[in-house]
Amino acid sequence: MVKVKKLFKTYGGKPVLKELDFEVEEGERVYILAPNGFGKTTFLKVLANIEPFQKGEIEVFGIKSPSHKIRVMISYISERDNLYPGFRIIDILRFISGFWEIDRSKFENFLFLLKINPLKRYSEFSKGERTLIRVALGLSIKAKIYLIDEPLSSLDFVLREKVVKLLGEMGGGTFILTSHEIDELLPFANRFVFLKDGKFFLETRDREKVKDIYREVFA
């Protein structure tokens, strides 16, 4: 489904991803773990065809990157607050619908669960609420793969639980998530990989070992 071979990527002249290999099968929920600044966001942006790469190969459903066909297969949910502050939520939905197919009933259900008024402007919501809106929008895209960058970062306990609830509503699907900490999404994932020195250093499917491995790898 996703195959990455010998991926090399520089950022600001500095190597960030170095001869990185990675594969994901359909239905996997992969959690990429590493401290901040280790290349997690860069890797997701390269996969999503947002950032270019210098060397290596990326293939998604048999299509080689870069390709617009890959971009529309993927829903990339950024940690950055990158939506349009003056737009109402319903207007943002209409805009995004011009690029991706949206499951409107799913989005409406998410807004109901979150108690978000779609007629309010994006700028009227708190920082944490805006994160919830971005996650809800991204998960409402009819994508083959969901790339979610640090979905719980800077959220309080109540909002973290809401993100977990949204993901729980998804049922099936293929997900690649990132985090710099072991958090509430640990039960959601079924595969855990550790990014260090520009490569995936180690991986496990055993949730019980994740905290110990993280401490060992990044001590």
What are these regions (language model features)?
Residues 55-70:
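Conserved ABC transporter NBD signature motif
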Residues 33-35:
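The feature captures the beta-strand-to-loop junction immediately N-terminal to the Walker
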Residues 48:
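Helix-to-loop junction immediately C-terminal to a conserved catalytic motif
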Residues 199-219:
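Conserved beta-strand-loop-alpha-helix hinge in the C-terminal portion
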Residues 178-180:
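H-loop/switch region of ABC-family ATPase nucleotide-binding domains
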Residues 107-125:
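Conserved ABC nucleotide-binding domain
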Residues 2, 17-19:
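Conserved structural motif at the start of ABC-family nucleotide-binding domains
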Residues 146-150:
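Catalytic Walker B motif of ABC-type/P-loop ATPase nucleotide-binding domains
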